[in-house]
């Protein structure tokens, strides 16, 4: 087989194997990264969780399989199984637990997660009412403000230069 034929065969084989294999061969597979967040603010409204304290976990997920399991997990199940997951898979998660009372604000700086690498970040809030109460935070944003309201929460991207 000529060089040209061998090259054509190799190219066709690579294309048939799929993009994931090619990305792996050239070192372009996705990898865990450090959050780019300059800050993360947790803010409980006056009536947060129907005027009750609320548990909030910021979770850096360091294992792709664990991410698949947690992505659809409601907060109630997370809080019920968190300790077991941390015991069973200690290297797969870094959990930053907080508890806020209504009208409380906690501001976190990038020193908190400095040097940590993760596939994704999730926030779980332990509301008294039923619901998912989970959000995924993109690691490549400047930061977030998590606003805990009466029956649910929102996570808004922090715009560079904007006040927290």
Label each region the model flagged.
Residues 35-37, 51-55, 91-93, 116-118, ...:
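Extracytoplasmic
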Residues 117-128:
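A short, solvent-exposed beta-strand micro-motif common in secreted/extracellular proteins
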């Amino acid at each position: 087989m000529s060089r040209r034929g061998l090259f054509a065969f190799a190219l066709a084989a690579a294309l048939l194997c799929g993009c994931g294999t090619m990305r792996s061969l050239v070192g372009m597979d996705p990898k865990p990264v450090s959050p780019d967040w300059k800050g993360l603010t947790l803010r409980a409204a006056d009536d947060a969780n129907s005027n009750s304290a609320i548990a909030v976990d910021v979770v850096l997920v360091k294992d792709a399989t664990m991410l698949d399991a947690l992505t659809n997990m409601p907060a109630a199940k997370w809080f019920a199984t968190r300790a077991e997951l941390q015991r069973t898979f200690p290297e797969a998660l870094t959990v930053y637990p907080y508890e806020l009372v209504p009208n409380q604000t906690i501001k976190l700086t990038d020193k908190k997660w400095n040097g940590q690498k993760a596939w994704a970040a999730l926030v779980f809030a332990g509301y008294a009412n039923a619901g998912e109460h989970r959000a995924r935070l993109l690691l490549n944003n400047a930061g977030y403000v998590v606003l805990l309201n009466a029956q649910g929460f929102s996570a808004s991207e922090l715009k560079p230069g904007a006040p927290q």
